[in-house]
Amino acid sequence: MATFVDTVTLHLRAGNGGNGCVSVRREKFKPLAGTDGGNGGNGGDIVLVADPQVTTLLAYHRGPHRSSRNGGPGMGDHRHGTLGETLELPVPVGTVVKDADGNELADMATPGMRFIAAEAGQGGLGNASLATTKRKAPGFALLGTQGYEGDVVLELKVVADVALVGYPSAGKSSLVAAISAAKPKIADYPFTTLHPNLGVVEVADSRYTVADVPGLIEGASEGKGLGLEFLRHVERCSALLHVLDCATLDPGRDPVSDLDIILTELAAYPVPDGQVPLLERPQLIALNKIDVPEARELAELVRPELEARGYRVFDISTVSHDGLRQLSFALAELVKDARTKAAEEPEAPRIVLRPRAVDEKPFTIRVDGGSYGDIYRVIGTKPERWVQQTDFRNDEAVGYLADRLAKLGVEDGLFKAGAVAGSSVVIGEGDGVVFDWEPTLTSTAELITSPRGADARVDPISRRTNQARREDYFARMDAKAEARAELVREGEAGLWADEDGTGQDGTDEDATTDAKA
């Protein structure tokens, strides 16, 4: 059973956002006291964390499907939904995150580094949050958006100071076991090592790590013999140690020809931008297996040629431990120089952002030909998110969506694109929301006499105070008294009489008139 996995595909599903709530507060003597629908909670993200204690991706090889929790729905009385718990996935330091198409998203090269691999959905707003001075009682709420669902590829690139490279069965694993406390698998057949082995070497006051890279053969840079998978682990090493087998019995092989083939493969391997090419890094040569008499003679024969090329050459034996101390100190010097150079040229902190399309406009309109005429497709982050948040069973919510799209300029864009009333409009790629477009000017929107969501039943009620009632009462009494006084003055002046003919003083006006005649 495999115990080391350096490549795995994760199937991620981030949590969805909770839906907003539609609710109206009820109080004593005031059954419609305003909106109080809470917002939905955001879903949980899926975050990758670079953990130095993790050395393999085996856990994700066995369980590649990972999902986080959804956000809770909003409730009445301004109660917001619960937040979905963030799911943290520890990965080894040196893990490269790629999308399904092979594009690099993040390089987890620093311990503790965090990367949001799957972004959660947003919670929808409740009708309390949608209420404004013009829309006092919204009868709708926004739905929560869906979280990211897709695949990401994790590739582990071992982080070590020194990489041991060479042909299979050259003694690389034996060298790691001899100079460190690592216990790799060692056998007398090629490709015993199928995954990198790390060992920590302590020399005087120096401490560094060495990586036993599986054996390389001719054509490794083209993928022959799993070469691409092995060479990937050499990218992050600051120095190279060529382990050459001086006791090989294979025909046509010798330390010099083995070195030339390995150098050719290292030169052909492309490194990421910003990294030093493999052959420009410090290199040492170890002539191994000199405990065999014929191997010692061959090492003495090829040493002058290798030194003439500018290499420092060490004769070693992992069996008798000859030359290992000198080699360990030499590697420590290379690592120390590399660390000093890196400290003199500090790299700016790498900020990892999830790649998103950046458009000059908030949306674009594309005209696609169809069997029933042109289809106008609206593509943009905001319009597509607004469509996800709309409950199309609620006419008021659909009207709110139309208002938002018109305010964003979608209607003007459709006019410019040549759309007319009745044209098919699609929002989003693929099987998006399709509807027959009806311009606002020709729809019933202009017949609405009040803003969407206005409800006179929940308007604030203004009650008169006792002082206002007293002032109103006294004003009415004063008006009545003045009216009586006016009637008395008119009666005394003879401008009017009662029904029985009696004037204001009680005399019969007709009799008085006859007597005067």
From Swiss-Prot:
Named cofactor requirement(s): Mg(2+)
EC number: 3.6.5.-
Residues of the Obg domain: 2-159
Binding positions for GTP per the UniProt entry: 166-173, 191-195, 212-215, 288-291, 317-319
Subunit structure: Monomer.
Keywords for this protein: Cytoplasm, GTP-binding, Hydrolase, Magnesium, Metal-binding, Nucleotide-binding
SUPFAM superfamilies (alphabetical): Obg GTP-binding protein C-terminal domain, Obg GTP-binding protein N-terminal domain, P-loop containing nucleoside triphosphate hydrolases
Pfam family, one: MMR_HSR1
Family: Belongs to the TRAFAC class OBG-HflX-like GTPase superfamily. OBG GTPase family.
OCT domain sequence ranges: 355-439
Region of interest (Disordered), residue spans: 490-517
Residue spans of biased composition, Acidic residues class: 497-517
One cellular component term from this protein's GO annotations in UniProt: cytoplasm
Ligand binding (Mg(2+)): S173, T193
Name of the gene encoding the protein in the UniProt record: obg
Chief subcellular location: cytoplasm
Function: An essential GTPase which binds GTP, GDP and possibly (p)ppGpp with moderate affinity, with high nucleotide exchange rates and a fairly low GTP hydrolysis rate. Plays a role in control of the cell cycle, stress response, ribosome biogenesis and in those bacteria that undergo differentiation, in morphogenesis control.
Molecular function per GO: GTP binding; GTPase activity; magnesium ion binding
Naturally occurring in which organism (per UniProt): Clavibacter sepedonicus
Protein name, entry field: GTPase Obg
Superkingdom, natural source: Bacteria
Parts forming coiled coils: none
InterPro entries in alphabetical order: G_OBG (IPR031167), GTP-bd (IPR006073), GTP-bd_Obg/CgtA (IPR014100), GTP-bd_prot_GTP1/OBG_C_sf (IPR036346), GTP1-OBG_CS (IPR006074), GTP1_OBG_dom (IPR006169), GTP1_OBG_dom_sf (IPR036726), OBG_GTPase (IPR045086)
